[in-house]
Regions:
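Short, charged beta-turn/beta-strand-edge "cap" motif at the junction between a beta-strand
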Residues: 60-64
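A residue-level detector for short acidic-glycine micro-motifs
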Residues: 35, 47, 80-82, 100
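Short, conserved beta-turn/loop elements at beta-strand boundaries and strand-helix junctions
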Residues: 25, 38, 83-88
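Short coil-to-beta-strand transition motifs
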Residues: 15, 68-77
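N-terminal helix initiation/capping motif
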Residues: 1-36, 44-46, 114-126
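C-terminal output/interaction extensions
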Residues: 87-126
Length: 126
């Protein structure tokens, strides 16, 4: 399912800010996602990460379980796909591909994305 006719991604992606910790050989970066899918994330980071840099990613995904809001920590391996300087700023918009993620975690992210898309489409924000 694609968002627009020009969209070529295989998985739904939602614009949503989720806390994320990105770890590489150069240290840890705390940031948040700009958008998310079960196959990757797009983040703004304060340092350039070269394409193909291997990362450990920790996402803090807000989930609703039995009418309670809980946080699910998802840890996976990832690879930088693209890093683009933001004009006039010292940040880089960085695309990350989840290269090694547990199937259940990928499903959890996908269910989250679908739920957020449904809320977005129907205007039901809780």
């Amino acid at each position: 399912m694609f968002s627009t006719p020009q969209e070529k991604r295989r998985h739904l992606r939602v614009d949503y800010k989720i806390p994320v910790k990105i770890s590489s050989d150069h240290g840890d970066i705390l940031t948040e996602t700009k958008n998310l899918s079960c196959s990757g994330a797009y983040c703004r980071v304060a340092q350039r990460l070269d394409p193909m840099t291997k990362l450990k990613v920790q996402l803090l995904l807000p989930l609703r379980k039995a009418e309670k809001l809980v946080t699910k920590k998802i840890i996976c391996q990832a690879v930088v796909v693209r890093a683009q300087a933001v004009d006039g700023e010292v940040y880089y918009d960085t695309a990350i591909f989840f290269s090694d993620i547990a199937s259940k975690d990928s499903r959890t992210i996908n269910e989250f994305v679908e739920a957020m898309m449904e809320k977005k489409n129907y205007g039901k924000f809780n």
